[in-house]
Amino acid sequence: MLIGEDFTKIRIDLNGLVILEPNAVISDFIMALASFYIAKKLYSTRRSSGFLKYWYYFFLTFAFGSILGSMGHGLFHYFGPQGKFPTWISAILSTYFIEKAMIKSYEQYNKNNILGKIAFFKMITVFLLVITVISSPAFDKNHTIGFLPIAINTLIGVFISVSVISAANIKTQVGFKWLLIGVFVM
């Protein structure tokens, strides 16, 4: 699938209830269950470090976003692209939380929380960019452009923050190699 490309949607009609993209509904629901499970596992340890706290926030936000995404995909026939807005918001927040988690693991080199400030500024900028895009006449013609800033933000947030900081942290904590491998697998 190409980012920004709109394909014909698979449609299921259940006694008058139209469900679109059932494959996305199922995969989003599975991601939500897995994320809720991981968030539950992190819940008791979330106060032990900023790193774990922000991973907990990431999985919790990602889980809620996946549930909303499941509904946004499935009920697209009724809500249109506006039904995906809550998921887009959660994607921006999830990316911010994953960046903050990685920044917290690198705190000894993060003087004056400059990386945290950059992540926050980037999050606000992406929110404003998405609002600008979805308010434009171009969005009315092609609603998929609204997701483009979110996709770019996620790529930057995950690939740069997780891979770069994991690579730097491998020297002191071997477990970061799994995060680095995970980024390359994606």
Model-derived regions, located:
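Membrane-interface helix caps and helix-loop-helix hairpins in membrane proteins
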Residues: 74-82, 133-148
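Alpha-helical transmembrane segments in multipass membrane proteins, preferentially the mid-helix core
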Residues: 36-40, 100-104, 129-141, 153-185
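Membrane-interfacial loop-to-transmembrane alpha-helix junctions, especially the N-terminal start
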Residues: 46-62, 110-123, 171-182
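Internal transmembrane alpha-helix with an interfacial aromatic "cap," most often the third helix
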Residues: 35-45, 70-82, 86-118
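Hydrophobic alpha-helical transmembrane segments of multi-pass membrane proteins
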Residues: 31, 54-75, 181-186
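Hydrophobic transmembrane alpha-helical segments in integral membrane proteins
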Residues: 4-32, 143-150
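Juxtamembrane loop-transmembrane helix junctions in multi-pass integral membrane proteins
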Residues: 8, 12-22, 46-53, 78-85, ...
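Physicochemical signature of membrane-embedded alpha-helices that form the seven-helix bundle of GPCRs
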Residues: 20-30, 57-61, 83-90, 149-152, ...
